Regions:
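Conserved acetyl-CoA binding element of GNAT-fold acetyltransferases
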Residues: 71-84
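Conserved acetyl-CoA-binding loop-helix of GNAT-fold acetyltransferases
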Residues: 82, 88-101, 113
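Conserved acidic functional residues
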Residues: 8, 115-116
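Conserved catalytic-core motifs of GNAT/GCN5-like acyltransferases
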Residues: 62-65, 114, 126-148
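Conserved GNAT acetyl-CoA-binding A-motif
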Residues: 100-115, 128
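Short amphipathic alpha-helix that is part of the acyltransferase structural core
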Residues: 1-33, 39-55, 74, 149-169
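Conserved acetyl-CoA-binding loop of GNAT-fold acetyltransferases
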Residues: 25, 108, 123-131
Length: 169
């Protein structure tokens, strides 16, 4: 069986909701995906499809780093989920790698996430890189990745996820 990673299509929305609900075992993240998409905050949404069935999903949304002088554009990764029976088989990693590659190719400079500190460093994320960013979620799970080396040099401020993240907590 081959897994294809592709851009989300309008006909995928209900299936993405189901994949996300199953992956997390609750509705919160599925509602977050719906709100990010519905509010125009989503910047990239990819699905993993196997034999005509969605088995995974990843979304990146707009975010801002509020500095003293200005706002610096960034992306937030998440949610990313894979249905339970296909977890641990590389689908999540493939989604993340493909999505990061697409974001880098389209000129994005910074991506931040809140995720497992033992998982995301393999993709280049680091809590240290997010060290000058303040957030209600600061800590070892709050990590950043620079698509452009030095993109976070001299950048300090409040990291703001898109508004639906506040409604999801």
């Amino acid at each position: 069986m081959s897994v294809e990673i592709r851009q989300e299509a309008a006909g995928d929305i209900l299936n993405i909701r189901e994949v996300t609900r199953k992956a997390f075992g609750r509705e919160v993240e599925a509602c977050l995906v719906d709100r990010l998409r519905g509010g125009g905050h989503a910047r990239l949404s990819l699905v993993a499809e196997e034999d005509g069935r969605l088995v995974g999903h990843i979304m990146f949304s707009e975010a801002t780093i509020r500095t003293e002088e200005t706002g610096v554009g960034a992306l937030a990764l998440g949610p990313v989920g894979v249905i339970p029976e296909r977890q641990g088989q590389g689908i999540g990693s493939a989604l993340i790698r493909e999505a990061l590659d697409r974001c880098a190719r389209t000129g994005h400079r910074i991506v931040v996430l809140l995720g497992h500190p033992d998982y995301y460093p393999r993709f280049g994320f680091s809590a240290e890189r997010a060290g000058n960013l303040s957030s209600a979620y600061s800590g070892e799970a709050f990590m950043a990745l620079e698509f452009v080396p030095g993109a976070l040099s001299g950048v300090a401020g409040e990291f703001e996820f898109a508004p639906p993240f506040g409604a999801a907590s």
